[in-house]
Amino acid sequence: LQNEFQTLIVSLTNEQRGVFDDVMAAIEDNKGGVFFVYGYGGTGKTFLWKTLSTAIRSKGQIVLTVASSGIASLLLTGGRTAHSRFGIPLNLTENSICSINRDSDASKLLKQTSLIIWDEAPMVHKHAFEALDRTLRDVLSFGNVRNSHIPFGGKVIVFGGDFRQILPVVPNGSRQEIVNASLSSSYIWTNCKVLKLTKNMRLTVGKDPSEIQQTRLFANWLLDIGEGNAGGSNDGDAVIRIPEDLLITQSSDPIGSLIEFVYPSLLDNLNDPKYFEERSILAPKNEVVQEIN
């Protein structure tokens, strides 16, 4: 692990190294700390998580890596969903706690943990973070009352994500209700040190200039949508025109054409895990997913 860490650490950008140093300093200080790493897709959050995890594990210490969804957790070494790892209730209220007892194995693991990384945090209801906060304050205060007065019981925790992407699902909720359900509307947010990643690393790996330019244009378009600039001024609703080169316009079987575009030569690659790691089809609703499947 030490050799792997040395390879990773020299590959960090200045931005990533700044975040890395801040988090590691908090761990060494042993007084806790809550961070939020704000970066859109492609800024290297996953690489940063890997570097932090390897740095800590190479010292024989424990880091828990979780994500808000199962798919996101697959990108993390030893990753699990936050709900599974911490026993977060599915039906949350403002007074919820996690199903972790003081004398349980999960409690013992948390006491020995040096760092918690929670990826894709913005998509989870704020009550989930507050439930974990209450639970850690309770579990970790046994033998040290001071921890009951420190966010997350004095553990260093790093949240990551992009508030321009998916926010918590509030059934039939208004814009205001959805925003109010977000992490940034929780009492926890006042304790978060926000660190930003702004450099798109995907623009540095392509060798073909035209490919880099195409990626840059697409990334800028996504950012415009996230910032609310793509559809003109609006109060939450907007009509956004999708570029022609992203549309399937002339096909008698659009779904078949989509699958062929995303999974070319599928039958020849059935035994190649990397082939499937590099591509996926996303849809906003289950009914669309079922239609494609």
Residue ranges and their predicted role:
Residues L1-N293:
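RecA-like helicase/translocase P-loop NTPase motor core
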